Structures are given as structure tokens and as C-alpha cells.
Amino acid sequence: VTADKIKTLSDIQYIPYTTKADLRDTYPFGMFSVPTKQLVRLHASSGTTGNPTVVGYTREDLDNWAEQVARVATAAGATQESMVQICFGYGMFTGALGLHYGLEKIGATVVPTSAGNTQKQLKFMRDFGTDTIVATPSYCLYLAESAKEEGHPIENYRLKLGLLGSEG
């Protein structure tokens, strides 16, 4: 497919795409478009329903990813003044590091607390003045409930922005 073949929205059907099944069927590196020696990072899904879905990133991929996250975070309201607590796991899950580097790119202060340890999350939010949170929507709800139970209602925190996702 060449660019001259794509003229209308309906022409998108001619663009080949990669499915999760494609990635699983060629586990681990069969669908990569560059040799593994050009990769600087690998991430993978948990593989609970089959082979893990492996994604490899080149330096250029990571730079582009950070730039895209920086743009999205800025559009959402994050700034270099933001104190951002990232509550996504920093393991093989691809989300935490992408957000981390994108937020650093705009000059925000990143607090990489990772997932879990709710009481420590809340303590850091209070003590550090966290104004932006990166988490799943359900974990944000759990944090609010836990804060109330601890006698520190979430309304008393400085939170004003949530970059939420990773739930289907």
C-alpha cells in the first residue's frame, strides 16, 4: 500500500495492521520490524490468556512516545509545576514508563510510587502535595475511600488532575 492509495476515510481498510493474535502467534520477536540489536527496551503483557504480547522499542520509538505523552499531558493540564504521582506498576507493563518520561519531558516532578501500598501512596500525596495522579480509575476510587477511612478525606488533598486508564 502506498500513500497515493489512501484518499478517503474508507480507504483505511487497505492499510495493513497488526493484531494481538499476530503478536502472540509469532512470540516473542517474530513481528518486530527491526533486528533485536536495534531495540533498547522490551515490554510484555502478563500472558494470562496465552503467550505474552511482547513489544520492542527503539530509541526513536521511546523519544516519540515521550513526545506524544508530553503533548497529551499538557493538553490535559499538566505543567512543569505539576507534582505527578504515578501509581501504575513499573514492571513489564508498558504504561508507567511511557507516562513517566513524557511527564519529565514537560518538566513535571514525577513521583514513581508504582502500584499498591495504598497508605504510603496517600502519605506521599499529602506530604509531597501531589496535584496530578496517574492510575486506574478503580484505584483512584479506592484511594479516595481509603483516605476517608484514615480521616483524611480526599477533598483535603491537592489533587486537581487525573491521567487515568488501563482498565478495559
Q: What does each of the following model-derived ranges do?
A:
Residues 3-4, 96-168:
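Conserved adenylate-forming
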Residues 32-33, 60, 89-90, 112, ...:
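Residue-level marker of alpha-helix boundaries and capping positions
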Residues 39, 62, 89-92, 138:
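Short glycine-enriched loops at secondary-structure junctions
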